[in-house]
Amino acid sequence: SYIIPDSVTSIGDGAFGCCSSLSSLVIPDSVVNIKGNPFYFWKGKLECLSASFIYEDNVLFNMDKSKLISYRNQEAKSFIIPNGVISIEKYAFSDCSSLISISVPKSVTSIGDGAFDGCSSLSSIAISDSVTSISAWTFDGCKSLRSLVIPDSVASIGNEAFRGCSSLCSLVIPDSVTSIGDGAFDGCSSLRSLVVSDSVTSIGDGAFDGCKSLRSLVISDSVTSIGDGAFGSCSSLRSLVIPDSVTSIGDGAFSSCSSLRSLVIPDSVVNIKGNPFCYWKGKLECLSASFIYEDNVLFNMDKSKLISYRNQEAKSFIIPDGVKSIGKCAFVDCYSLVSISIPNSVTNIGDGAFDGCSSLSNLVIPNSVTSIGDGAFWGCSSLRSLVIPNSVTSIGAWAFSGCKSLSNITIPDSLTSIGAWAFDGCSSLCSLVIPNSVTSIDAWVFSGCKSLSNITIPDSLTSIGAWAFEGCSSLSSLIIPDSVTSIGNSAFAGCKSLSNIIIPDSVTSIGDSAFEDCTSLSSLAIPDSVTCIGFGAFEGCSSLRDLVIPNSVNDIEDRAFEGCNFPDNLKQELIFRFGDKIFE
């Protein structure tokens, strides 16, 4: 509950937005100014005492009814916006999930951000030809909207304006529109055909991402740039002509367009960001003098960057000397590649560079490489051993995730950071030494490494992230150095062979489910430094019978020791100190 005092004269935009537990509000008569819509995504009861506004039939207007601030009827199926309304405010109809149809009068010139966001039953709406722009998120989540006529007055379509309009089948973008925002039609999975008008100059990032039914697309020769992921996952798109007007193509622009047979990079293109063609296996042709395309490999002009390798049949490849960067997803899903030679000129291996190269078994990373990107070797299931050179300072998230044959890896002293999920699912990895240069182990780094029986954790480490060693079922003993201050949620959950662990005096908190289902753990001494033990921290530790909890511990969450078979005297002592909630 909240009472707006009579001293208040102005209420700001979104002031009570998303206050889901607030049952009611009264706008006092002192309020003379309301900015935007203070009440979006709030469904409570509203009352207005101010003479500066009109509140009738659960709709809040300004005094002359030129501005519709908030529509609050959650049950109505249709609504006619009164003639004379000029502006529909930000999120005015948000989450009105019962509304099926709305009539917009010709007086309306402005529709605010997210005006109809979440109107999931809305199937019919006519936009008047006085509206000049469709703002960001205007129809976001209007999943029942089947068709829409965008009038010639509209000059721009905002970011994510029609995101998730999964029933929208067809659309004509009029000649008046000059820009299509990021994610404008993201997830419009029923959209089958589209004509981009002659006036559009830019197609935003992810503009048509996930339009999986889109078969026909015409891009006009007014377009100069195609954004990142603009047509990503348009899996039914069969043909596309990039016009000669385009000078720039974004990263992942045609990613996962699995039905697209061919593409031609026109001579007008001078800039390619990242890899526009990742997860696409069609035929590529390049007419641009700004790039080199030879033997099914796309490079930049001076061949310092390998953008895309497109030979799906080759079993081996030698990257030319002089290449400095292996681009994002450059070799993605090259299932036939068994070996690859990387020259000493390479300094960077990009995100997902060898993702899905399931036959790759022979690889040497040269001393010139300083970083291994996110998911760089994700799913390289035949890779058995790897030496990471002393030049590498960072290993990205998911870098070796799913490398299930990787049994031996050497991590150098130069390494300072290991990203989340970096070795997740490396089920053959037996032992590992983490160097002193590493200060933290992120979430899920060694999750699912079920053969990992021996690991050395350095004194430099200060934190062990959530799920860091979850499911390492062969890990039998572990010494946590006294530099560590926190053990994250589920950090050692499912380590069924872990029978001996020493928690140092530096640790102050043990996270939720940190040692859940460590069924071999028989004894444990919690140090004086620990003040709290998380929810279910030792749940399912069925062999744990000997436990020492110091007086420093003042909070033990529910179920912390559920399923632990303590002797009766120890169990009663713990119940006396912390209550029976810790066992249920």
Regions of interest found by a model, annotated:
Residues C278:
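Short, conserved loop/helix-junction motifs that constitute active-site signature segments
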Residues N62-K65, N300-K303:
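Short acidic-glycine loop/turn motifs at beta-strand connectors
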Residues G12-G17, G36-N37, K90-A92, G112-D117, ...:
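Consensus positions within tandem repeat domains that build extended binding/scaffold surfaces
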Residues S1-S10, S20-N33, K43-V59, Y71-S87, ...:
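Structural signature of tandem-repeat unit edges
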